[in-house]
Amino acid sequence: MSASLEGRLDINLILHADVVGEIAVRSSRPRLAQKLMAGLTPLAAAERAGLIFSLCGKAQRAAAEVACEAALGIQSGAEIEIMRAQQVLIELAQEHAWHFLLHWPQRAAETADMASLLALRKSAADPTQFSLKLEQLLNDVFLGEPASRWLTHDLAAFDLWRKQAATLPAKLFRTWGGGADHGISQAPLLPPLRQLAPSQCAELAHLALANEDFCGQPEWTGGPAETGAIARQQQHSLLAAWIDARGRGAGARLLARLIELANLPQQLAGNQVAVVKAFNLGENIGMSAIETSRGLLIHVVRLAGGRVADYRIVAPTEWNFHPAGALVEALTQAIADLAPCEAAATCAEAVCQSLDPCVSFAVEVSHA
């Protein structure tokens, strides 16, 4: 999708007597799902979804396909369901790998590992080969040891690993130290898809259909919520120990991605948790929910005469960058004691990056 269609996020730190006293999050992301999809056949809608979104394109296409099939009352065969889940997981793995091999190293003034990232991407067409390549890279590049062993580490063993291992992720975690996490948030976590009841999904779908503004500022049980790997991995013992000791901040989000990445070869081998679900809501209405690298993606469609009449998309970025959500709460706590403008802006950028928006963002400092 072009930049004009994607929009962007503007985070404004408003100073009162040289101290950040207010945080404003404004999104210029246009809600174009209705305009782009209305009047299309289900097949054309799925094709368009895969083309217009530059990030998570496979997940977006799958979401459109699944939502339209649900509206038509079509039940996909087991082979198609497995193929879709594998494509979503492969795309998710590549996004996580990009963070650890390219994005965060550049921010931390470390040397990026583009060669490993390209090797992983070259194997993406074959789930078996991708799983084998990812397992090898986890051992040689990401962790420095077998993923099965690394995943058993408690917090003390993890701290020893990040201090001693020569891998790029270990070096990145060294910068966190052993103190409190950066940008701690207490915002509720959106339950992972595997824990969402059909009635809860149906409620989200009906809210989106009834009010298009809900798609831009979604709420869970009456308030904002955070979604992503941290919500899916919150019960893992290592992540839970980190959060108990250091808080749920940028470091916890990064750790959740690494834990999820380390588990992905096993998931691709067949031990898959729910990453794609379909819901027929009656009256030619269908909903899909898909776990992407950034969090839960929801598509809702109402068909009339075999074509799209209403279409809604609730993307992870809208959850995490809600004007009163996880970002604002995290920044409020993180920069409360940071008087220098530069320190506050740097902190804000790091927290924003940890929440991983699917569009560009800018942090600005202004006076009240």
Annotate the PLM regions.
Residues 311-312:
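Acidic, carboxylate-rich catalytic segments that either coordinate divalent cations
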Residues 303:
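Short, acidic, Ser/Thr-enriched surface-loop or helix-capping motifs
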Residues 306:
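Mixed-charge (Asp/Glu-Lys/Arg
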Residues 1-294, 317-368:
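Active-site bordering "gate/hinge" segments
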